[in-house]
Curated annotation (Swiss-Prot):
Upper taxonomic lineage: Bacteria, Pseudomonadati, Pseudomonadota, Acidithiobacillia, Acidithiobacillales
Annotated signal sequence range: none
This protein's UniProt keywords: Metal-binding, Ribonucleoprotein, Ribosomal protein, RNA-binding, rRNA-binding, Zinc
Protein name in UniProt: Small ribosomal subunit protein uS14
Described purpose of this protein according to its UniProt entry: Binds 16S rRNA, required for the assembly of 30S particles and may also be responsible for determining the conformation of the 16S rRNA at the A site.
SUPFAM superfamilies the record matches: Glucocorticoid receptor-like (DNA-binding domain)
UniProt remark on cofactor binding: Binds 1 zinc ion per subunit.
């Protein structure tokens, strides 16, 4: 879990828009972020395997 201060800091609008960065909606992680889903790779994997994300199916061939 990310520090609460960093999560709050990322939610504020920065002085310069170049400084803005994404964080996971669930855990607040900043790295490994999937823009399309708004989740980090860990939360994405957990929710995809649980079937919480519609349209995502585990690949098998």
């Amino acid at each position: 879990m990310a520090k609460k201060s960093l999560i709050a800091k990322s939610e504020r609008t920065p002085k310069f828009k170049v400084r803005a960065y994404h964080r996971c909606k669930l855990c607040g992680r900043s790295r490994g972020y999937y823009r399309k889903f708004g989740l980090c790779r860990l939360c994405f994997r957990k929710h995809a395997s649980a079937g919480s994300i519609p349209g995502i199916v585990k690949a098998s061939w």
